[in-house]
A protein has these predicted regions:
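Surface-exposed amphipathic alpha-helical tracts and adjacent flexible/coil segments at the periphery
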Residues: 1-21, 26-33, 52, 58-68, ...
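Gly/Gly-Pro- and Ser/Thr-rich, intrinsically disordered tail segments characteristic of DNA damage-repair
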Residues: 76, 115-124
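Conserved phosphotransfer cores of two-component systems
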Residues: 108
Length: 408
């Protein structure tokens, strides 16, 4: 059995490198154009080329999103862009639009194509057609259940990618017009400019049904009827693998370095444990605990085992919980030296928690600090400042330092 791929988001070069170091098999990213995350940082052409070189050097893959639903004016330069992706040997382009798909086949015939979830592939006949047109993989609509995925895989011999973790959209496969409505067309979600309107605070009243109430009218704080919980499938790795998924996708190109690294580390352990133990596999509580330490809304399995109903929505608040602060990042250093880049204030003598690229977690005490001028300091208040730290514990490069948030 071919091992399921762990696919992670890469909004920036730093995030890409961290997700690969923390165990992702592949990353998906976007260029400055033609993607659905216009505000996710994204990559210049040269950065994409470097990303491919870096990932391939680790034996890993890079997929580039070309998944906008384009208008006529969006097509300008698309042919050259697709040729460039082919030229730098990206491992696949993620495409949702039929016209873009056709153009890619025409101008970049050796460029592998994965059909984006925005294409809303929800049945085996649709998947079969995409395969016949030349797609190597289909990212199933998020609304497809595990059972439906298994049925599709039995009928069509093609790679299937499924979302396993991250924020969910209230719209069918992300096809939403709320951003267009609230900005009078100035921000268009299907062209990469989503304003997260589904997370706004709303109050809803239906005047023609007196005496009939919905949970959205529970209290004076309004409602978040559009505000989905976050997807979490950490408890269901066997079902995804045995159901025929080729790739498990983590959402979050606009999330922090800490978020993507920690989530990848948890799913890396779960996937590897499944293949090592098979019939004896069991979910570890520490995996769940790790996912509780990143910014998240309450978790749900959404459509995986039933049609999503009111329980898949979060009615209390729109902002995710942020239980831990990302405090610092251990940088490469000479033997016997520990260098740390500040990401949040910390001080000498403080107890912090660490998360290594292998997913190991533990506590340590911050030792004496020296700043870039060689001066001893008792705290690290400056953003991104690099300090030398004395510590008896040897922490590997790119270890994350964190602490429980005071509000968490």
């Amino acid at each position: 059995m071919k091992k399921i791929e762990l696919l992670a988001p890469a909004g920036t070069m730093e995030k890409m490198k961290m997700t690969l170091l923390y165990g992702a098999d592949a990353v998906y990213l976007a260029g400055k154009v033609f993607g659905l995350r216009a505000y996710g940082g994204n990559f210049t052409k040269e950065e994409m080329k470097e990303a491919v070189r870096y990932a391939h050097g680790m034996g890993k893959k890079v997929y580039v999103t070309v998944n906008i639903i384009p208008r006529n004016e969006d097509l300008e330069g698309l042919d050259d862009y697709l040729r460039y992706l082919e030229e730098i040997h990206v491992d696949a382009a993620l495409i949702s639009d039929l016209g873009v798909f056709s153009l890619a086949r025409e101008v970049a015939p050796t460029l592998p194509i994965h059909v984006s979830t925005q294409a809303s592939a929800a049945n085996w006949r649709t998947v079969k057609v995409w395969k016949e047109m030349g797609a190597e993989r289909v990212v199933l609509a998020r609304e497809v259940s595990v059972k439906e995925m298994a049925d599709i895989r039995k009928k069509v011999d093609i790679e299937l990618e499924v979302f396993g973790h991250g924020a969910m959209c209230i719209s069918w496969s992300g096809r939403c017009l709320l951003s267009n409505f609230f900005t009078h067309g100035k921000r268009q979600s299907n062209r990469g400019e989503c304003i997260q309107a589904c997370r706004f605070k709303y109050s809803v009243m239906e005047e023609s049904r007196p005496g009939q109430y919905w949970p959205i009218e529970e209290d004076e704080h309004g409602t978040y009827i559009f505000n989905s919980k976050d997807l979490c499938m950490i408890d269901h790795i066997p079902e995804l693998i045995e159901g025929g998924a080729s790739s498990l996708k983590i959402e979050g190109r606009m999330k922090s370095v800490y978020y993507v690294a920690a989530v990848v580390a948890a799913y890396r352990k779960a996937i590897d444990t499944y293949y090592a133990e098979r019939g004896a596999y069991r979910v570890r509580e520490e995996w769940r605990e790790e996912l509780e330490k990143v910014s998240h809304r309450p978790y749900t399995t959404a459509f995986a085992f039933q049609e999503a109903d009111h329980t898949a929505q979060e009615y209390v608040k729109s902002q995710p919980e942020q239980p831990y602060d990302f405090v610092g990042l251990i940088l490469p250093a000479e033997e016997g030296t520990t260098r740390v880049q500040q990401r949040n204030h910390f001080r000498v003598g403080e107890t912090l928690e660490y998360l290594t690229p292998k997913g190991d977690v533990g506590l340590f005490t911050v030792g004496p600090l020296t700043n870039g001028e060689g001066e001893a300091v008792d705290r690290a208040p400056h953003p991104l400042e690099v300090l030398t730290m004395q510590t008896e514990m040897k922490l590997p490069a790119y270890t994350i330092l964190r602490r429980r948030a005071k509000h968490g």
